[in-house]
Amino acid sequence: MATSSAHLSFLAGRISPFSSERIGLFPLRGEFRPRMTRFRCSAGPSGFFTRLGRLIKEKAKSDVEKVFSGFSKTRENLAVIDELLLFWNLAETDRVLDELEEALLVSDFGPKITVRIVERLREDIMSGKLKSGSEIKDALKESVLEMLAKKNSKTELQLGFRKPAVIMIVGVNGGGKTTSLGKLAHRLKNEGTKVLMAAGDTFRAAASDQLEIWAERTGCEIVVAEGDKAKAATVLSKAVKRGKEEGYDVVLCDTSGRLHTNYSLMEELIACKKAVGKIVSGAPNEILLVLDGNTGLNMLPQAREFNEVVGITGLILTKLDGSARGGCVVSVVEELGIPVKFIGVGEAVEDLQPFDPEAFVNAIFS
């Protein structure tokens, strides 16, 4: 599979100079042999930059393949589009677009988004702008990509310049919230970030134990509740204070899973948000809502409610590798205007991937 330069440049920016030794790029002694020529200085085939470039390419290819594999079920649903467009002709436009519309609906693009996409294609076909099946396919992909890559929609984490940056992880029960936090910690740690975890889920008895396992697994420090009746806001406040005093880069704050209809628990999130903001001005930098990809369009009411209460800055969509409803990604971004930051495309610790709109579109419309 070809790996785009965008993927390579993105990944190059994600490799921290502090993590080079950990990923096997050092020591350099005896290996880095620059060759001077009249025009340039280049590294030998076994040198640092050669190995760094190879590592970046391999990592980029691996990440793209994971995303491609993760959306296999959605891609199967949408494969009918290729069949429809293979022998497309103008006389069959209405039939083809009706079946294309059905394929998008089955994949949970939602009625509003689906109608908008199909009617735009119809208009371009009838005006003569689109004259072949391949042109229609390209226009379909471009239309979806435009919805995902809106202006001012930042898919990267916005961590600001004050340390520590604070990231709150919120969501309903069973969405993969604590697991996503652990995987995010693993990713940040491997990039050379000093990470502190905060076990703010004081409602579920096993939550703290689960996060402690993730802390041990990722090599991160953790702050847990003192006593059975500790308040979540107190735990998070204590963690952010420690993060500030001990020079941590990021504090990842777990919170109790809650139904979006439970007002008292939603109020607790407001208290948590205020508590961390008192320690570090502008915190939390990110409030990430974890949503189960298997719920499809049913995630929209959850996202709306959480957003109204605490102001969601980004989404983590989990369990998409087992879902045929990948179109919900487009719906939630387009209807709520909240960017997807990460997607879960597998059970492995490395399978929480930064969301790349172009890679996503290529994965569902192969």
Swiss-Prot record:
Effect of substituting residue 49 to A: Reduced binding to the thylakoid and 40% reduction of LHCP integration in thylakoids. Reduced binding to the thylakoid and 80% reduction of LHCP integration in thylakoids
Effect of gene knockout: Seedling lethal.
Effect of residue 51 to A: Reduced binding to the thylakoid and LHCP integration in thylakoids
UniProt keyword terms in alphabetical order: Chloroplast, GTP-binding, Membrane, Metal-binding, Nucleotide-binding, Plastid, Receptor, Thylakoid, Transit peptide
Swiss-Prot/TrEMBL GO biological process terms: SRP-dependent cotranslational protein targeting to membrane
Binding annotation for GTP: 171-178, 254-258, 318-321
GTP-binding recorded as keyword: yes
Disulfide bonds: none
Effect after changing residue 71 to V/A/L: Reduced interaction with FFC, but no effect on the basal GTPase activity
Induction remarks: Not induced by light or iron.
Impact noted for substituting residue 52 to A/Q: Reduced binding to the thylakoid and LHCP integration in thylakoids
GO molecular function, one term: ATP hydrolysis activity
Impact after mutating residue 56 to A: Reduced binding to the thylakoid and LHCP integration in thylakoids
Subcellular location(s) of the protein: Plastid, Chloroplast stroma; Plastid, Chloroplast thylakoid membrane
Keyword Transport found: no
Cellular component terms per the entry's GO annotation: chloroplast stroma; chloroplast thylakoid membrane
Result when mutating residue 326 to W: Reduced interaction with FFC, but no effect on the basal GTPase activity
Consequence of substituting residue 48 to A: Reduced binding to the thylakoid and 80% reduction of LHCP integration in thylakoids, but no effect on GTP binding. Reduced binding to the thylakoid and 80% reduction of LHCP integration in thylakoids
Annotated membrane topology: Peripheral membrane protein
InterPro entries the record matches: AAA+_ATPase, P-loop_NTPase, Signal_recog_particl_SRP54_hlx, SR_rcpt_FtsY, SRP/SRP_N, SRP54_GTPase_dom, SRP54_N_sf
UniProt function note: Signal recognition particle receptor protein. Binds GTP specifically. The GTPase activity is inhibited by the N-terminus of the protein until binding to the thylakoid membrane. Activates the GTPase activity of FFC/cpSRP54 when bound to the cpSRP complex. Required for light-harvesting chlorophyll a/b-binding protein (LHCP) integration into thylakoids. Might be also functionally linked to the Sec translocation machinery.
Misc note: Unlike eukaryotic or prokaryotic signal recognition particle (SRP), the chloroplast SRP from higher plants lacks an SRP-RNA component. It targets both chloroplast-encoded and nucleus-encoded substrates to the thylakoid membrane, post-translationally for the nucleus-encoded proteins and co-translationally for the chloroplast-encoded proteins.
Subunit description: Monomer. Interacts with FFC/cpSRP54, a component of the cpSRP complex, composed of a FFC/cpSRP54 monomer and a CAO/cpSRP43 dimer. The complex with FFC/cpSRP54 is formed when both proteins are bound with GTP.
Record text about domains: The N-terminal domain (39-56) is necessary and sufficient for thylakoid binding.
Family assignment from sequence similarity: Belongs to the GTP-binding SRP family.
Protein name according to UniProt: Cell division protein FtsY homolog, chloroplastic
Upper lineage: Eukaryota, Viridiplantae, Streptophyta, Embryophyta, Tracheophyta
